Regions:
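A short catalytic or substrate-binding loop motif that flags glycine-/basic-rich loops and adjacent residues
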Residues: 23, 32-35, 160-163, 170-171, ...
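Solvent-exposed loop/turn segments at secondary-structure junctions
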Residues: 35-37, 55-58, 83-86, 107-109, ...
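Metallo-beta-lactamase
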Residues: 47-48, 55-57, 166-170, 175-281
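Accessory terminal helices/loops
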Residues: 1-11, 120, 147, 236-240, ...
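Divalent metal-coordination and catalytic microenvironments
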Residues: 27, 42, 52, 67, ...
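Conserved beta-strand hairpin/beta-sheet module of binuclear metal-dependent hydrolase folds
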Residues: 18-71, 190-203
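Active-site HxH/HxHxD metal-binding segment of metal-dependent hydrolases
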Residues: 65-164
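Extended catalytic-interface subdomain
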Residues: 123-171, 176-179, 209-211, 221-225, ...
Length: 417
């Protein structure tokens, strides 16, 4: 059987890339595919600046060896585009020479008592990233091929915080403009080199539909602000954009033809969702109604290899309006087990449901099969059979989706059943 999502994901985001150093100018080098994340080397008068610090000490060590082939000037400054672990994890490899680590403050306050969620955060992170899957099962990160672990997470502490919409710095002869650009994270900043007309954009752009909502769970990512940040990137008219994941965008025309439709696609989904909410549409109605227009639907960088449009719509609804969908029936809910038992009786008993599940599986109607399995599991009847069928359904759904995050979550939970 061919799984369409799996095939598309493998063809577009499943091919391993060797690490490479791309010379952008005489003083700017793009350190690409050292692990999942990229970094950029800026050569100053007597020292170097590193924009981002890789995902682990192992990948940072490999990059450090390549840096030594380019220059004998030490890395003395690290500038972080944001503080996701995969962009800070190798910082300590440069600790013997680095004396400044610069980052932007967060544009939003982190919710309190997050430590009470540490267990479920761990579980859902493992599911989203497919940590317990084989490389073949995981297939892709959604931003490129799965890469093997290489060392440990060893970040350096931030020594200097930027708390302004824009900060102009000169570090050892290198002019930098740090531009607040909240998006995938609230502490995101662009690192712009005005003399070279080069922009490091962190994770506000990568060549996939972005994680406007992360299924591992997170605070709301302000999609409106993300669009505004992409407007800032477009307005720079940079000749080169260096993303935190994937290949460099080289040439001013190339930059515009990639970033503009990326921005337009995200903005379209945001505004159509808000218009639908204003009409009283529920999240389920919105995800069935909203699709990218034809001029954006086939844009390569808007394909759903990482996030998905459906998750984005649901995230926007929740972020703006919370959990309540406006239907007063949902102001109160039945006990899950009681509801499942009543549903089973209404459907003529467990035998009828099992036959319907088997029929759905035979017809490859796996979403329906999984939902029927949940009725039995919630009622705590025929649990072993229901789990076996649900495992089969989740494996199918995981292999049919193009989203690596979705694939990982489906297949991880299936393995646990």
């Amino acid at each position: 059987m061919e799984y369409a999502g799996e095939r598309k994901l493998k063809e577009n985001m499943g091919t391993p890339h060797p690490s490479e150093v791309v010379k952008i100018t005489d003083s700017v080098y793009f350190l690409n595919y050292f692990g999942t994340s990229n970094a950029t080397l800026l050569i100053g008068d007597t020292s170097c600046i590193l924009v981002d610090a890789f995902e682990s000490d192992g990948y940072a060590e490999a990059a450090k060896q390549e840096i030594a082939k380019i220059t004998d000037k030490p890395v003395k400054t690290i500038v972080l585009t944001h503080q996701h672990p995969d962009h800070i994890g190798g910082g300590a490899v440069f600790a013997d020479t680095v004396d400044r680590v610069i980052a932007h403050t967060s544009a939003a306050v982190t919710y309190g008592r997050m430590e009470l969620l540490k267990d479920i955060v761990t579980v859902r992170n493992l599911h989203q990233f497919g940590a317990k899957l084989t490389a073949e099962e995981a297939l892709s990160s959604g931003l490129g091929a799965v890469v093997p672990p290489n060392g440990q997470l060893r970040p350096m502490a931030v020594t200097e915080w930027i708390d302004a919409p824009k900060a102009e710095l000169t570090i050892d002869g290198v002019d930098l403009v740090l531009i607040a650009a909240a998006g995938e994270t609230d502490d995101q900043q662009f690192v712009y080199l005005p003399k070279e007309n080069v922009a490091c954009c962190g994770d506000d752009y990568y060549a996939s539909w972005p994680n406007l909502y992360a299924i591992r769970g997170s605070q709301y990512r302000d999609v409106s602000v993300w669009v505004d940040s992409l407007d800032k990137l477009i307005a720079l008219n940079a000749a080169v954009v260096l993303p935190g994941h994937g290949d460099a965008l080289i040439g001013a025309e190339r930059v515009q033809e990639v970033i503009k439709p990326y921005r337009d696609g995200i903005n379209y989904v945001l505004e159509e969702t808000l218009k639908g909410i204003n009409k009283g549409m529920t999240p389920d109605e919105l995800v069935n109604a909203i699709h990218l227009p034809v001029e954006l639907a086939d844009v390569p960088q808007l394909q759903e290899y990482y996030g998905t449009i459906e998750w984005s719509i649901r995230g926007i609804y929740s972020g703006y309006f919370g959990w309540y969908d406006g239907n007063p029936t949902h102001l109160g809910t039945m006990n899950v087990k009681d509801k499942a038992e009543k549903t089973i009786r209404m459907m003529g008993g467990t035998g009828n449901i099992l036959r319907e599940i088997a029929d759905a599986v035979a017809k490859e109607d796996m979403q329906w099969a999984a939902e029927l399995c949940d009725i039995l599991l919630n009622a705590q009847v025929e649990a072993d059979v229901a789990k076996a069928y649900k495992k089969q359904a989740l494996e199918y759904l995981g292999r049919m989706t193009t989203s690596a995050n979705g694939r990982h979550y489906y297949l991880s939970v299936a393995k646990e059943l």
